[in-house]
């Protein structure tokens, strides 16, 4: 068993990866670890070990497995099998640094799979901080300040073209698509939408992207 700092695992890039998590069939009062398998070889081994002990294997996105750990008081650690030769353990406390990102992912994933209305998703996300490529007005404008954003061309259902503001859940995710090395700015989602008066699209390059018109 290895302990690896959560920031070294690159979990954000894998939030929509389908994994297998082992949940107890009976509600437990004593804390236990949540085991996750990401390879078939590890899954086969873990099934033999855990199913006789009353655990059930469930397929779900990694982000939802992380959400389970954060929301449920009876989990202690996350144990990931298949990423390295040894299993990796991450404490619940360390994972909590990802809580806001995981929460946003779960909202976006549910909306992308038609389990949550877009308007409800916006209500849940409007107060969150997102990152966009560009700048807003500052209190004291400096010479050379450029007020701008990186947009994406979209087509409405009636065929009308329009532009949406690209947003991201993390600064690192924004930088990944920032070829021109422009400033990356954090902003409240509702304020950003109001400031530009345009639709916003969050994580447009991922399968769970969401757009608020």
Q: Where in this protein do the model-derived segments appear?
A:
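An interfacial alpha-helical scaffold signature
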Residues: 1-213
């Amino acid at each position: 068993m290895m302990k690896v700092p959560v920031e070294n695992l690159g979990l954000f890039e894998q939030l929509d990866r389908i994994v297998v998590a082992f949940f107890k069939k009976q509600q437990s009062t004593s804390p236990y670890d949540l085991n996750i398998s990401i390879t078939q070889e590890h899954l086969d081994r873990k099934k033999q070990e855990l199913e006789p002990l009353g655990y059930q294997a469930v397929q779900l996105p990694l982000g939802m497995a992380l959400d389970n750990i954060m929301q449920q008081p009876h989990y202690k650690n996350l144990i990931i099998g298949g990423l390295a030769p040894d299993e990796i353990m991450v404490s619940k406390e360390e994972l909590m640094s990802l809580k806001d990102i995981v929460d946003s992912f779960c909202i976006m994933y549910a909306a992308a799979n038609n389990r949550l209305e877009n308007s409800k998703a916006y209500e849940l996300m409007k107060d969150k901080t997102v990152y966009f490529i560009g700048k807003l007005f500052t209190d004291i404008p400096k010479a050379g300040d450029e007020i701008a954003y990186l947009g994406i061309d979209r087509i409405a259902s009636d065929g009308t073209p329009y532009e949406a503001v690209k947003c991201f859940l993390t600064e690192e995710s924004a930088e990944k698509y920032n070829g021109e090395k422009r400033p990356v700015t954090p902003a409240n989602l509702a304020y950003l939408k109001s400031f530009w008066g345009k639709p916003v699209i969050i994580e447009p390059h991922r399968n769970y992207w969401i757009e608020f018109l």
